């Protein structure tokens, strides 16, 4: 089992010392959140809070995903950084390919490209991208990012994007794992075609159903390649629970030590955060 340290919506000056501490403590990876901006007016709902409220995000600091990962990659040597998750279809896929390929090449293939479709029309409006057909759009984006990060010539002609034969360098020396986030069946189907699935949290029984579904979709598609399953689960906080998750096929447990979905700034001191992640490493990571 691998363990991924999660922190978000906190003082952005904490990220560098937290990444260093997570690497020293034995975590395999760290999640990197993504958000472009917060709208003044919105009636759309957040899918991972009970009431759909997302006002807690107002004013929360989000360093741009690629910028933050580059900074953290420069001060670590082993820790992988998993985007959790990048709102891919609101961005130009060729630019994402250049950013992801450059980043992975620069920090030694330590990038997991977690992607998803933003559920909020405001993100699409801000970036000048139609909200309609976002599922088909992300499918094309994934194919383009894959193709343009190989270091070979690649072309693509689809409904939304037309890429002439093009080569991007530098390219990473290993393929960038593409991990798809989301609980909808369309997201699970997309994940089954990719390199992994990222769980957004929720009911334990629902997690079992989602894991079984994505496994079944991979079997139906004849997929036998290595596949990552990243989950948020209370079972991830005990040795016995981790073993149960392993038995279900989970490869990566995402662990955080506070609930970020709260109003106002995060007031937890840096040293408390570091001690929390160290205690978990001592009590769980070191024993599995």
Curated annotation (Swiss-Prot):
SUPFAM superfamilies: Bacterial luciferase-like (SSF51679). GO terms for molecular function: oxidoreductase activity, acting on paired donors, with incorporation or reduction of molecular oxygen. One of its GO terms (cellular component) is plasma membrane. InterPro entries: Diverse_substr_monoxygenases (IPR051260), Lucif-like_OxRdtase_Rv2161c (IPR019921), Luciferase-like_dom (IPR011251), Luciferase-like_sf (IPR036661). PANTHER family: ALKANESULFONATE MONOOXYGENASE-RELATED (PTHR30011), CONSERVED PROTEIN (PTHR30011:SF32). This is Uncharacterized protein Rv0940c. The lineage of its organism: Bacteria, Bacillati, Actinomycetota, Actinomycetes, Mycobacteriales.
């Amino acid at each position: 089992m691998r363990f991924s340290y999660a922190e978000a919506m906190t003082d952005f000056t904490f990220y560098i010392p937290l990444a260093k501490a997570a690497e020293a403590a034995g975590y395999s990876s760290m999640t990197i959140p993504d958000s472009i901006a917060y709208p003044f007016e919105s009636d759309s709902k957040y899918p991972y809070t009970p009431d759909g409220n997302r006002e807690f995000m107002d004013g929360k600091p989000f360093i741009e995903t690629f910028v933050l990962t580059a900074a953290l990659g420069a001060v670590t040597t082993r820790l992988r950084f998993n985007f959790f998750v990048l709102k891919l279809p609101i961005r130009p896929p060729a630019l994402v390919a250049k950013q992801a390929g450059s980043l992975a090449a620069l920090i030694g293939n330590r990038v997991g490209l977690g992607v998803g479709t933003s559920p909020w029309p405001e993100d699409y409006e801000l970036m000048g991208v139609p909200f309609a057909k976002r599922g088909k759009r992300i499918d094309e984006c994934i194919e383009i990012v894959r193709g343009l990060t190989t270091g070979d010539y690649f072309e693509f002609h689809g409904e939304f994007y037309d890429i002439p034969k093009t080569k991007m360098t530098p390219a990473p020396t290993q393929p960038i794992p593409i991990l798809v986030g989301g609980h909808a069946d369309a997201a699970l189907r997309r994940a089954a075609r990719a390199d992994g699935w990222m769980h957004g949290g929720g009911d334990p029984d629902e997690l079992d159903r989602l894991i079984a579904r994505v496994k079944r979709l991979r079997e139906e598609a004849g997929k036998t390649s290595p596949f990552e399953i990243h989950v948020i689960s209370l079972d991830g906080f005990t040795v016995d629970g981790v073993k149960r998750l392993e038995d279900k096929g989970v490869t990566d447990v995402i662990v955080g030590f506070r609930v970020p979905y709260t109003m106002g700034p995060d007031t937890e001191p840096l040293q408390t955060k570091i001690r929390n992640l160290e205690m978990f490493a001592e009590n769980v990571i070191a024993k599995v």
